[in-house]
């Protein structure tokens, strides 16, 4: 990208706009959680055993081998026990609390499934891709929060990422099961898999937030996963200031009024400070 196309990196100018904003949308992606040590399972080195996320995070993979897929997600859930919200998550949560006290509005729309925003204290969080800590019953369709560790006894000690530590598959009858009355249906992770559509109700709410905001922040996202990749450019098209915070420029950077390069955990505490 040539310099003439680069947006402003003037933090003082951004903060003047921030102080006047009444409704702020903060779009977050994997770059925010990466600073907490959360693996993305995308790109080089993003393997679990010998599988990529594209091999396991699909409806067909779950139909053919639910035990293997549950081991993968059990590993990811258990791995989160050692992870904590970082300075970026905390800065966003503190900003939301401060704005709420002043009668202003902040909404976090995240592509992440790790609930680190909520653990930091964010309240208005829309999870575009679901959550590692929610389940959905294939039989009754009930969605439930679930922070059990392990999620079921049969998965205790399972899910090692090492291809040398593969034990016997857990029988389907012992995988996580629905506890709603007498349902007993097989549970799946409540996450959006490859080849699945995003939840229409979540998209509708996101659209409402994006259409009513007067400032938008794009934080730690490569802006390549659709439909989220189009959210901020569409906000910019209606003349609303958009600021991107990322380690590098993206395919969408030229749409935005501001771009700040660097770790989100360093940039956001400065950008969102009182």
Swiss-Prot record:
<dbReference type="GO" id="GO:0005634">
    <property type="term" value="C:nucleus"/>
</dbReference>
<feature type="active site" description="Proton acceptor">
    <location>
        <position position="129"/>
    </location>
</feature>
<keyword id="KW-0479">Metal-binding</keyword>
<keyword id="KW-0496">Mitochondrion</keyword>
<feature type="binding site">
    <location>
        <position position="264"/>
    </location>
    <ligand>
        <name>NAD(+)</name>
    </ligand>
</feature>
<dbReference type="InterPro" id="IPR026591">
    <property type="entry name" value="Sirtuin_cat_small_dom_sf"/>
</dbReference>
<dbReference type="GO" id="GO:0017136">
    <property type="term" value="F:histone deacetylase activity, NAD-dependent"/>
</dbReference>
<comment type="function">
    <text>NAD-dependent lysine demalonylase, desuccinylase and deglutarylase that specifically removes malonyl, succinyl and glutaryl groups on target proteins. Has weak NAD-dependent protein deacetylase activity; however this activity may not be physiologically relevant in vivo.</text>
</comment>
<feature type="domain" description="Deacetylase sirtuin-type">
    <location>
        <begin position="4"/>
        <end position="274"/>
    </location>
</feature>
<dbReference type="GO" id="GO:0005759">
    <property type="term" value="C:mitochondrial matrix"/>
</dbReference>
<feature type="binding site">
    <location>
        <position position="183"/>
    </location>
    <ligand>
        <name>Zn(2+)</name>
    </ligand>
</feature>
<feature type="binding site">
    <location>
        <position position="140"/>
    </location>
    <ligand>
        <name>Zn(2+)</name>
    </ligand>
</feature>
<dbReference type="InterPro" id="IPR050134">
    <property type="entry name" value="NAD-dep_sirtuin_deacylases"/>
</dbReference>
<dbReference type="Pfam" id="PF02146">
    <property type="entry name" value="SIR2"/>
</dbReference>
<feature type="binding site">
    <location>
        <position position="73"/>
    </location>
    <ligand>
        <name>substrate</name>
    </ligand>
</feature>
<dbReference type="GO" id="GO:0061697">
    <property type="term" value="F:protein-glutaryllysine deglutarylase activity"/>
</dbReference>
<feature type="binding site">
    <location>
        <begin position="29"/>
        <end position="48"/>
    </location>
    <ligand>
        <name>NAD(+)</name>
    </ligand>
</feature>
<dbReference type="GO" id="GO:0036055">
    <property type="term" value="F:protein-succinyllysine desuccinylase activity"/>
</dbReference>
<feature type="binding site">
    <location>
        <position position="178"/>
    </location>
    <ligand>
        <name>Zn(2+)</name>
    </ligand>
</feature>
<feature type="binding site">
    <location>
        <position position="137"/>
    </location>
    <ligand>
        <name>Zn(2+)</name>
    </ligand>
</feature>
<dbReference type="GO" id="GO:0005829">
    <property type="term" value="C:cytosol"/>
</dbReference>
<feature type="binding site">
    <location>
        <position position="76"/>
    </location>
    <ligand>
        <name>substrate</name>
    </ligand>
</feature>
<dbReference type="InterPro" id="IPR026590">
    <property type="entry name" value="Ssirtuin_cat_dom"/>
</dbReference>
<feature type="binding site">
    <location>
        <begin position="111"/>
        <end position="114"/>
    </location>
    <ligand>
        <name>NAD(+)</name>
    </ligand>
</feature>
<keyword id="KW-0862">Zinc</keyword>
<dbReference type="InterPro" id="IPR027546">
    <property type="entry name" value="Sirtuin_class_III"/>
</dbReference>
<dbReference type="GO" id="GO:0008270">
    <property type="term" value="F:zinc ion binding"/>
</dbReference>
<dbReference type="InterPro" id="IPR029035">
    <property type="entry name" value="DHS-like_NAD/FAD-binding_dom"/>
</dbReference>
<comment type="similarity">
    <text>Belongs to the sirtuin family. Class III subfamily.</text>
</comment>
<dbReference type="InterPro" id="IPR003000">
    <property type="entry name" value="Sirtuin"/>
</dbReference>
<dbReference type="GO" id="GO:0005739">
    <property type="term" value="C:mitochondrion"/>
</dbReference>
<feature type="binding site">
    <location>
        <begin position="220"/>
        <end position="222"/>
    </location>
    <ligand>
        <name>NAD(+)</name>
    </ligand>
</feature>
<protein>
    <recommendedName>
        <fullName>NAD-dependent protein deacylase</fullName>
        <ecNumber>2.3.1.-</ecNumber>
    </recommendedName>
</protein>
<keyword id="KW-0520">NAD</keyword>
<dbReference type="GO" id="GO:0070403">
    <property type="term" value="F:NAD+ binding"/>
</dbReference>
<feature type="binding site">
    <location>
        <begin position="246"/>
        <end position="248"/>
    </location>
    <ligand>
        <name>NAD(+)</name>
    </ligand>
</feature>
<dbReference type="GO" id="GO:0036054">
    <property type="term" value="F:protein-malonyllysine demalonylase activity"/>
</dbReference>
<keyword id="KW-0808">Transferase</keyword>
């Amino acid at each position: 990208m040539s310099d003439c196309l680069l947006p402003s990196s003037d933090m003082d100018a951004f903060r003047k706009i921030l102080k006047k904003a009444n409704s702020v949308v903060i779009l977050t992606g994997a770059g925010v959680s990466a600073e907490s040590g959360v693996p993305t399972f995308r790109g080089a080195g993003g393997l679990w055993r010998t599988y990529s996320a594209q091999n396991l995070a699909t409806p067909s993979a779950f139909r053919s081998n639910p035990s293997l897929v549950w081991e993968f997600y059990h590993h990811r859930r258990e791995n989160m026990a050692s992870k904590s919200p970082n300075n970026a998550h905390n800065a966003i949560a503190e900003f939301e609390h401060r704005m709420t006290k002043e009668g202003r509005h902040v909404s976090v729309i995240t592509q992440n499934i790790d609930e680190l925003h909520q653990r930091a204290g964010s309240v208005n969080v829309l999870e575009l891709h679901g959550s590692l800590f929610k389940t959905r019953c294939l039989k009754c369709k009930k969605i439930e929060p679930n922070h059990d560790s392990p999620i079921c006894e049969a998965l205790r000690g399972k899910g090692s990422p090492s291809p040398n530590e593969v034990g016997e598959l857990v029988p389907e009858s012992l995988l996580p099961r629905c506890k709603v009355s007498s349902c007993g249906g097989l549970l799946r992770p409540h996450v959006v898999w490859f080849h699945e559509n995003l939840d229409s109700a979540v998209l509708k709410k996101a659209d409402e937030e994006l259409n009513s905001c007067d400032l938008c922040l794009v934080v730690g996202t490569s802006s390549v996963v659709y439909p989220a990749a189009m959210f901020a450019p569409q906000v910019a098209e209606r003349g609303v200031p958009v600021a991107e915070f990322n380690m590098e420029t993206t395919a969408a950077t030229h749409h935005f009024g501001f771009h700040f390069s660097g770790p989100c955990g360093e940039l956001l505490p400065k950008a969102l400070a009182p």
